[in-house]
Amino acid sequence: MFVFQIETSDGMNTPQYIGSLNTVSEIDWYHHCSTNSTAVNDLFTGQMVDMRLCDACLRVAVSTQLFHILPVPIAEPYPLHGLVSLEACLAQFAQIELMGGANGLVCDHCNRLRLLSDRSSRPDPAVVVTPIGNHITPLSPISGGSDLMNDSIGRETQQRTSTPIQSRPQPSTSLVLTDCRRRSLIGYLPSCLVIQLMRFSAGPGRQSTKLCLPVVIPLNRLDMSLYVLHNVDPAGAGLSEPSEDFYNLYAVCLHLGSDSTNNGHYVTYARCADDVWYCFDDDQVRAVNIEYELTTRLVRQNAYLLFYERAF
């Protein structure tokens, strides 16, 4: 993971901001490619760029994260037909998210300023007037001191995952949480893109729950260009340059039954070398019409992992 901080920014779509993000993304990606050259990395590894803009000081924390599986939240269904499009899920993944309160940002810069302000406002022990019998010497301890300089703004980045995890630990009471805007985009797309639909979340009592909303899965020409960092237009008027980031589906993994990933049954639909789609259900294998299967309630409500390959 690579962590970087942009000193000031007027927003998340300014030319300075986008240009700096592209530089950070390229440095991290070229370093990864120069030190990792395997078939798995060449085919399945991509890069995600996570940005957090502090609303108080307008500094941007940037972190990069390599991925083999891209976790994507499930969007709200369309009111008319109750279906969810995969494109809507990807758009929700890439949208700017407002965060505050307990989910706010531990901004290194803001906390450093607060620490310096506290220290400057603290009375000098050498000149404090104290009652007789309670004389302060240079060796007397000073209460209330704390060192926040080791906290990094980049440490706030959490890996996205569909697997239920424990709630985020609350920061020390001496730290200040600031409101922020968060956005995640894709720095580099892999040749083989694996999308994980985030169907599982932690419920009351740490029990996981499964979201069975029906997701419409494109078979061909899934356009990923809208979610790639170097395609973001600083003016907000669309793509800054043409892109050819289309993907075709070659496999789908379903999770059936349980509300937990630890249990349940997995079924896979895959396109084989003969260009025929098959359903793999334990020891049972049968040829299927994938265009029909993708319209069924079984597939739409239980699709968990989607396997796409770049279209050439």
PLM feature spans:
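Papain-like cysteine protease catalytic cores
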Residues: 1-66
